[in-house]
Swiss-Prot record:
Involved in chemotaxis. Part of a chemotaxis signal transduction system that modulates chemotaxis in response to various stimuli. Catalyzes the demethylation of specific methylglutamate residues introduced into the chemoreceptors (methyl-accepting chemotaxis proteins or MCP) by CheR. Also mediates the irreversible deamidation of specific glutamine residues to glutamic acid. Residues 141-188 are annotated as: Disordered. Residues 187-378 form the CheB-type methylesterase domain. The modification 4-aspartylphosphate is found at D55. One of its GO terms (biological process) is chemotaxis. The gene is cheB2. NCBIfam families: PRK00742.1 (NF001965). This is Protein-glutamate methylesterase/protein-glutamine glutaminase 2. Residues 145-155 have a biased composition (Pro residues). It comes from Pseudomonas fluorescens (strain Pf0-1). The active site is at S202, H229, D322. HAMAP family: CheB_chemtxs. It holds the Pfam family Response_reg. Residues 156-168, 178-188 have a biased composition (Low complexity).
Length: 378
Protein backbone atom coordinates (compact mmCIF):
# COMPACT_ATOMS: atom_id res chain seq x y z
CA UNK A 1 0.00 0.00 0.00
CA UNK A 2 1.32 3.44 -0.94
CA UNK A 3 2.38 5.89 1.76
CA UNK A 4 -0.11 8.78 1.75
CA UNK A 5 1.55 12.19 2.10
CA UNK A 6 0.18 15.68 2.75
CA UNK A 7 2.55 18.45 1.54
CA UNK A 8 2.34 21.74 3.46
CA UNK A 9 4.20 24.87 2.30
CA UNK A 10 3.23 28.45 1.47
CA UNK A 11 5.64 28.44 -1.50
CA UNK A 12 3.88 27.26 -4.65
CA UNK A 13 7.22 26.29 -6.18
CA UNK A 14 8.23 24.17 -3.20
CA UNK A 15 4.80 22.50 -2.94
CA UNK A 16 4.97 21.53 -6.61
CA UNK A 17 8.56 20.27 -6.50
CA UNK A 18 8.08 18.24 -3.32
CA UNK A 19 4.84 16.79 -4.72
CA UNK A 20 6.56 15.92 -8.03
CA UNK A 21 9.54 14.30 -6.29
CA UNK A 22 7.34 12.20 -4.01
CA UNK A 23 4.88 11.27 -6.76
CA UNK A 24 7.74 9.89 -8.86
CA UNK A 25 8.03 7.10 -6.28
CA UNK A 26 5.29 4.55 -7.07
CA UNK A 27 5.08 3.60 -3.39
CA UNK A 28 4.21 7.17 -2.33
CA UNK A 29 0.92 8.98 -3.02
CA UNK A 30 0.53 12.73 -2.48
CA UNK A 31 -3.07 12.96 -1.30
CA UNK A 32 -3.21 16.72 -0.82
CA UNK A 33 -1.44 20.03 -0.30
CA UNK A 34 -1.90 22.98 2.05
CA UNK A 35 -0.56 26.53 2.08
CA UNK A 36 -0.60 27.28 5.83
CA UNK A 37 -0.87 25.64 9.23
CA UNK A 38 -4.62 25.98 9.53
CA UNK A 39 -5.18 24.31 6.16
CA UNK A 40 -2.73 21.60 7.24
CA UNK A 41 -4.84 20.76 10.28
CA UNK A 42 -8.05 20.67 8.24
CA UNK A 43 -6.45 18.50 5.55
CA UNK A 44 -4.88 16.17 8.10
CA UNK A 45 -8.27 15.61 9.72
CA UNK A 46 -10.01 15.07 6.37
CA UNK A 47 -7.37 13.05 4.47
CA UNK A 48 -5.72 11.12 7.31
CA UNK A 49 -2.28 10.99 5.64
CA UNK A 50 0.47 8.63 6.79
CA UNK A 51 3.06 11.43 6.71
CA UNK A 52 2.94 15.25 6.59
CA UNK A 53 5.80 17.38 5.21
CA UNK A 54 5.67 20.79 6.86
CA UNK A 55 7.30 24.17 6.35
CA UNK A 56 7.78 26.45 9.34
CA UNK A 57 7.21 30.01 8.12
CA UNK A 58 3.66 30.27 6.75
CA UNK A 59 0.82 32.82 6.92
CA UNK A 60 -2.16 32.43 9.29
CA UNK A 61 -0.48 29.72 11.37
CA UNK A 62 3.16 28.65 11.51
CA UNK A 63 4.39 25.09 11.28
CA UNK A 64 5.20 24.56 14.96
CA UNK A 65 1.74 25.62 16.08
CA UNK A 66 0.22 23.37 13.43
CA UNK A 67 2.33 20.43 14.63
CA UNK A 68 1.09 20.93 18.20
CA UNK A 69 -2.53 20.91 17.05
CA UNK A 70 -2.03 17.92 14.77
CA UNK A 71 -0.42 15.89 17.56
CA UNK A 72 -3.39 16.65 19.78
CA UNK A 73 -6.17 16.06 17.25
CA UNK A 74 -4.88 13.53 14.70
CA UNK A 75 -1.36 12.37 15.61
CA UNK A 76 0.61 11.93 12.38
CA UNK A 77 4.36 11.69 11.67
CA UNK A 78 5.59 15.12 10.53
CA UNK A 79 8.75 15.81 8.51
CA UNK A 80 9.78 19.45 8.93
CA UNK A 81 11.64 21.51 6.35
CA UNK A 82 14.15 23.90 7.87
CA UNK A 83 16.61 26.59 6.84
CA UNK A 84 20.32 25.93 7.45
CA UNK A 85 20.77 28.78 9.94
CA UNK A 86 21.10 29.01 13.72
CA UNK A 87 17.55 30.39 13.87
CA UNK A 88 16.38 27.61 11.56
CA UNK A 89 18.00 25.10 13.91
CA UNK A 90 16.25 26.62 16.93
CA UNK A 91 12.88 26.52 15.18
CA UNK A 92 13.43 22.94 14.01
CA UNK A 93 14.30 21.78 17.52
CA UNK A 94 11.12 23.46 18.79
CA UNK A 95 9.17 21.56 16.12
CA UNK A 96 10.73 18.26 17.20
CA UNK A 97 9.79 19.12 20.77
CA UNK A 98 6.23 19.74 19.60
CA UNK A 99 6.05 16.26 18.08
CA UNK A 100 7.64 16.35 14.61
CA UNK A 101 9.61 13.18 13.89
CA UNK A 102 12.43 14.39 11.65
CA UNK A 103 13.59 17.28 9.47
CA UNK A 104 15.31 18.10 6.19
CA UNK A 105 17.13 21.29 5.22
CA UNK A 106 15.08 23.40 2.82
CA UNK A 107 17.64 24.00 0.12
CA UNK A 108 16.29 25.30 -3.20
CA UNK A 109 19.77 25.08 -4.76
CA UNK A 110 20.01 21.35 -4.03
CA UNK A 111 16.58 20.75 -5.56
CA UNK A 112 17.75 22.38 -8.80
CA UNK A 113 21.29 20.95 -8.94
CA UNK A 114 20.91 17.50 -7.36
CA UNK A 115 17.34 16.37 -8.00
CA UNK A 116 18.18 12.64 -7.79
CA UNK A 117 20.00 13.03 -4.48
CA UNK A 118 17.12 15.09 -3.08
CA UNK A 119 14.59 12.53 -4.31
CA UNK A 120 16.46 9.65 -2.71
CA UNK A 121 16.82 11.43 0.64
CA UNK A 122 13.27 12.76 0.77
CA UNK A 123 11.63 9.48 -0.22
CA UNK A 124 13.84 7.56 2.21
CA UNK A 125 12.81 9.89 5.05
CA UNK A 126 9.11 9.63 4.16
CA UNK A 127 9.21 5.83 4.04
CA UNK A 128 11.15 5.68 7.28
CA UNK A 129 8.94 7.93 9.36
CA UNK A 130 5.79 6.37 7.91
CA UNK A 131 6.82 3.20 9.71
CA UNK A 132 6.67 5.11 12.99
CA UNK A 133 2.98 5.77 12.36
CA UNK A 134 1.78 2.99 14.65
CA UNK A 135 3.50 4.68 17.57
CA UNK A 136 1.51 7.87 17.09
CA UNK A 137 -1.88 6.48 18.10
CA UNK A 138 -0.69 6.69 21.70
CA UNK A 139 0.85 10.16 21.46
CA UNK A 140 0.12 12.39 24.41
CA UNK A 141 0.89 16.07 24.00
CA UNK A 142 -0.22 19.21 25.82
CA UNK A 143 -3.57 20.46 24.62
CA UNK A 144 -3.37 23.47 22.29
CA UNK A 145 -4.68 26.74 23.60
CA UNK A 146 -7.36 27.15 20.95
CA UNK A 147 -10.27 24.77 20.32
CA UNK A 148 -11.97 23.37 18.40
CA UNK A 149 -10.67 25.30 15.37
CA UNK A 150 -7.16 26.66 15.94
CA UNK A 151 -7.01 30.43 15.82
CA UNK A 152 -4.28 32.11 13.78
CA UNK A 153 -1.48 33.43 15.95
CA UNK A 154 1.46 35.51 14.78
CA UNK A 155 4.28 33.48 16.28
CA UNK A 156 5.06 30.16 17.81
CA UNK A 157 4.65 29.68 21.53
CA UNK A 158 7.81 30.20 23.60
CA UNK A 159 10.16 27.27 23.27
CA UNK A 160 12.21 25.46 25.86
CA UNK A 161 15.21 27.48 24.70
CA UNK A 162 14.00 29.93 27.32
CA UNK A 163 15.00 33.55 27.88
CA UNK A 164 18.41 34.86 28.84
CA UNK A 165 17.08 35.48 32.35
CA UNK A 166 16.42 31.78 32.95
CA UNK A 167 18.48 30.09 35.68
CA UNK A 168 21.80 28.78 34.44
CA UNK A 169 21.06 25.21 35.59
CA UNK A 170 17.29 24.76 36.12
CA UNK A 171 15.58 21.62 37.23
CA UNK A 172 15.17 19.52 34.08
CA UNK A 173 12.03 20.10 32.05
CA UNK A 174 10.22 16.98 30.89
CA UNK A 175 10.42 16.29 27.18
CA UNK A 176 7.16 15.77 25.27
CA UNK A 177 6.20 12.15 25.76
CA UNK A 178 4.22 9.53 24.00
CA UNK A 179 2.22 7.17 26.16
CA UNK A 180 4.62 4.92 28.09
CA UNK A 181 5.66 1.78 26.28
CA UNK A 182 5.93 -1.56 27.99
CA UNK A 183 9.27 -1.77 29.78
CA UNK A 184 11.95 -3.92 28.24
CA UNK A 185 12.88 -7.09 30.08
CA UNK A 186 16.59 -6.52 30.85
CA UNK A 187 17.42 -6.39 34.57
CA UNK A 188 18.75 -3.24 36.22
CA UNK A 189 22.47 -2.71 35.57
CA UNK A 190 25.31 -3.37 37.98
CA UNK A 191 27.55 -0.51 38.98
CA UNK A 192 30.93 -0.31 37.25
CA UNK A 193 33.77 2.20 37.16
CA UNK A 194 33.04 3.56 33.68
CA UNK A 195 35.47 6.14 32.33
CA UNK A 196 33.16 7.27 29.51
CA UNK A 197 29.48 7.20 28.53
CA UNK A 198 28.96 7.36 24.75
CA UNK A 199 25.49 7.81 23.26
CA UNK A 200 24.69 7.53 19.54
CA UNK A 201 21.38 8.32 17.85
CA UNK A 202 19.68 9.62 14.70
CA UNK A 203 15.96 10.07 13.88
CA UNK A 204 14.07 10.84 17.09
CA UNK A 205 17.35 11.52 18.85
CA UNK A 206 16.93 15.16 19.88
CA UNK A 207 13.92 14.42 22.07
CA UNK A 208 15.36 11.07 23.21
CA UNK A 209 18.64 12.68 24.30
CA UNK A 210 16.74 15.37 26.14
CA UNK A 211 14.76 12.68 27.97
CA UNK A 212 17.89 10.76 28.96
CA UNK A 213 20.24 13.61 29.85
CA UNK A 214 17.75 15.51 32.01
CA UNK A 215 17.75 12.53 34.38
CA UNK A 216 21.46 12.86 35.14
CA UNK A 217 22.62 14.75 38.27
CA UNK A 218 25.04 17.68 38.13
CA UNK A 219 27.51 15.49 40.03
CA UNK A 220 27.48 12.76 37.36
CA UNK A 221 30.93 11.14 37.71
CA UNK A 222 31.77 10.22 34.11
CA UNK A 223 32.40 12.24 30.94
CA UNK A 224 29.79 11.87 28.18
CA UNK A 225 30.07 12.07 24.41
CA UNK A 226 27.00 12.44 22.20
CA UNK A 227 26.77 11.57 18.51
CA UNK A 228 23.57 12.78 16.84
CA UNK A 229 23.15 12.74 13.05
CA UNK A 230 22.58 16.44 12.41
CA UNK A 231 23.74 19.14 9.94
CA UNK A 232 26.61 21.45 10.81
CA UNK A 233 24.36 24.46 11.39
CA UNK A 234 22.25 22.62 13.97
CA UNK A 235 24.55 21.02 16.54
CA UNK A 236 25.61 24.23 18.29
CA UNK A 237 21.97 25.26 18.83
CA UNK A 238 21.12 21.74 19.99
CA UNK A 239 23.99 21.71 22.50
CA UNK A 240 22.90 25.11 23.82
CA UNK A 241 19.36 23.84 24.20
CA UNK A 242 20.44 20.74 26.13
CA UNK A 243 22.73 22.82 28.33
CA UNK A 244 19.78 24.98 29.41
CA UNK A 245 17.59 21.96 30.16
CA UNK A 246 20.07 19.65 31.90
CA UNK A 247 21.82 19.71 35.27
CA UNK A 248 25.01 18.46 33.65
CA UNK A 249 26.84 20.79 31.27
CA UNK A 250 26.49 20.28 27.51
CA UNK A 251 28.50 21.92 24.72
CA UNK A 252 29.33 21.36 21.08
CA UNK A 253 32.70 19.62 21.00
CA UNK A 254 35.76 21.49 19.73
CA UNK A 255 39.14 20.12 18.79
CA UNK A 256 41.29 19.80 21.91
CA UNK A 257 38.41 19.71 24.41
CA UNK A 258 39.20 17.56 27.45
CA UNK A 259 36.66 15.08 28.75
CA UNK A 260 35.60 15.67 32.34
CA UNK A 261 32.89 14.37 34.69
CA UNK A 262 29.51 16.06 34.36
CA UNK A 263 30.24 17.42 30.87
CA UNK A 264 28.58 16.10 27.72
CA UNK A 265 30.30 16.92 24.43
CA UNK A 266 28.12 16.84 21.29
CA UNK A 267 29.87 15.89 18.06
CA UNK A 268 29.71 18.84 15.62
CA UNK A 269 27.63 18.34 12.49
CA UNK A 270 29.50 17.78 9.24
CA UNK A 271 32.62 16.49 11.05
CA UNK A 272 33.89 13.43 12.90
CA UNK A 273 34.72 13.21 16.60
CA UNK A 274 37.37 10.91 18.06
CA UNK A 275 38.65 10.42 21.60
CA UNK A 276 42.31 9.77 22.38
CA UNK A 277 43.83 7.93 25.34
CA UNK A 278 44.52 11.18 27.21
CA UNK A 279 40.83 12.07 27.21
CA UNK A 280 41.22 14.74 24.55
CA UNK A 281 38.76 15.26 21.72
CA UNK A 282 39.89 15.31 18.10
CA UNK A 283 37.57 16.90 15.54
CA UNK A 284 38.28 15.80 11.99
CA UNK A 285 36.83 16.89 8.64
CA UNK A 286 33.88 14.84 7.47
CA UNK A 287 34.97 12.06 5.12
CA UNK A 288 32.80 12.09 2.00
CA UNK A 289 33.09 8.30 1.82
CA UNK A 290 31.08 8.02 5.03
CA UNK A 291 27.30 8.40 4.98
CA UNK A 292 27.13 10.07 8.36
CA UNK A 293 28.88 13.19 9.60
CA UNK A 294 29.16 12.77 12.54
CA UNK A 295 29.35 8.98 12.51
CA UNK A 296 28.62 6.92 15.63
CA UNK A 297 30.96 4.13 14.49
CA UNK A 298 33.91 6.53 14.32
CA UNK A 299 33.47 7.83 17.87
CA UNK A 300 32.62 4.42 19.33
CA UNK A 301 35.66 2.91 17.61
CA UNK A 302 38.04 5.53 19.00
CA UNK A 303 36.54 5.07 22.48
CA UNK A 304 37.10 1.31 22.23
CA UNK A 305 40.77 1.90 21.41
CA UNK A 306 41.30 4.48 24.15
CA UNK A 307 39.20 3.13 27.04
CA UNK A 308 39.22 -0.66 26.62
CA UNK A 309 36.50 -2.10 28.91
CA UNK A 310 35.57 1.16 30.64
CA UNK A 311 32.94 2.50 28.20
CA UNK A 312 29.16 2.42 28.60
CA UNK A 313 27.76 2.84 25.07
CA UNK A 314 24.08 3.48 24.44
CA UNK A 315 22.40 3.33 21.02
CA UNK A 316 19.11 5.21 20.81
CA UNK A 317 16.39 5.57 18.16
CA UNK A 318 17.47 6.12 14.55
CA UNK A 319 17.47 4.92 10.95
CA UNK A 320 20.09 2.57 9.59
CA UNK A 321 22.83 0.68 11.41
CA UNK A 322 25.38 3.35 12.38
CA UNK A 323 26.96 2.37 15.69
CA UNK A 324 26.89 -1.39 15.12
CA UNK A 325 30.51 -1.78 14.03
CA UNK A 326 31.75 0.61 16.70
CA UNK A 327 29.73 -1.32 19.28
CA UNK A 328 31.34 -4.53 18.04
CA UNK A 329 34.79 -3.07 18.77
CA UNK A 330 33.63 -1.91 22.20
CA UNK A 331 32.32 -5.37 23.04
CA UNK A 332 35.57 -6.99 21.89
CA UNK A 333 37.38 -4.79 24.42
CA UNK A 334 35.01 -5.71 27.24
CA UNK A 335 32.88 -2.55 27.32
CA UNK A 336 29.12 -2.47 27.85
CA UNK A 337 26.53 -1.74 25.13
CA UNK A 338 22.86 -0.93 25.67
CA UNK A 339 20.10 -0.49 23.07
CA UNK A 340 16.78 1.32 23.25
CA UNK A 341 13.79 -1.02 22.97
CA UNK A 342 11.57 -1.12 19.90
CA UNK A 343 8.42 0.04 21.68
CA UNK A 344 9.91 3.41 22.71
CA UNK A 345 11.88 4.14 19.50
CA UNK A 346 10.62 6.58 16.88
CA UNK A 347 12.60 4.53 14.33
CA UNK A 348 13.80 1.08 15.40
CA UNK A 349 16.81 0.91 13.10
CA UNK A 350 20.10 1.57 14.89
CA UNK A 351 19.08 -0.22 18.12
CA UNK A 352 17.70 -3.13 16.09
CA UNK A 353 21.07 -3.48 14.35
CA UNK A 354 22.74 -3.76 17.77
CA UNK A 355 20.24 -6.34 19.01
CA UNK A 356 20.30 -8.44 15.82
CA UNK A 357 24.11 -8.53 15.91
CA UNK A 358 23.88 -9.86 19.49
CA UNK A 359 25.85 -6.88 20.79
CA UNK A 360 23.37 -5.59 23.40
CA UNK A 361 24.16 -6.31 27.04
CA UNK A 362 20.79 -4.81 27.91
CA UNK A 363 17.70 -3.40 26.17
CA UNK A 364 15.78 -0.67 27.98
CA UNK A 365 12.83 1.61 27.28
CA UNK A 366 13.68 5.27 26.73
CA UNK A 367 12.12 6.32 30.03
CA UNK A 368 14.41 3.92 31.92
CA UNK A 369 17.73 4.59 30.19
CA UNK A 370 18.61 7.78 32.06
CA UNK A 371 18.00 6.31 35.51
CA UNK A 372 19.87 3.14 34.58
CA UNK A 373 22.87 5.19 33.44
CA UNK A 374 22.85 6.82 36.87
CA UNK A 375 22.57 3.43 38.60
CA UNK A 376 25.47 2.06 36.55
CA UNK A 377 27.79 5.02 37.08
CA UNK A 378 26.98 6.84 40.32
Amino acid sequence: MAVKVLVVDDSGFFRRRVSEILSADPSIQVVGTATNGKEAIDQALALKPDVITMDYEMPMMDGITAVRHIMQRCPTPVLMFSSLTHEGARVTLDALDAGAVDFLPKNFEDISRNPEKVKQLLCEKVHSISRSNRRFSAYSAPAPAAAPTPAPIPAAAPSSFGSHSAPARPAPAPAPTRAPAASASSPAPKRKNYKLVAIGTSTGGPVALQRVLTQLPASFPAPIVLIQHMPAAFTKAFAERLDKLCRISVKEAEDGDILRPGLALLAPGGKQMMIDGRGAVKILPGDERLNYKPCVDITFGSAAKSYSDKVLAVVLTGMGADGREGARLLKQGGSTVWAQDEASCVIYGMPMAIVKADLADAVYSLDDIGKHIVEACV
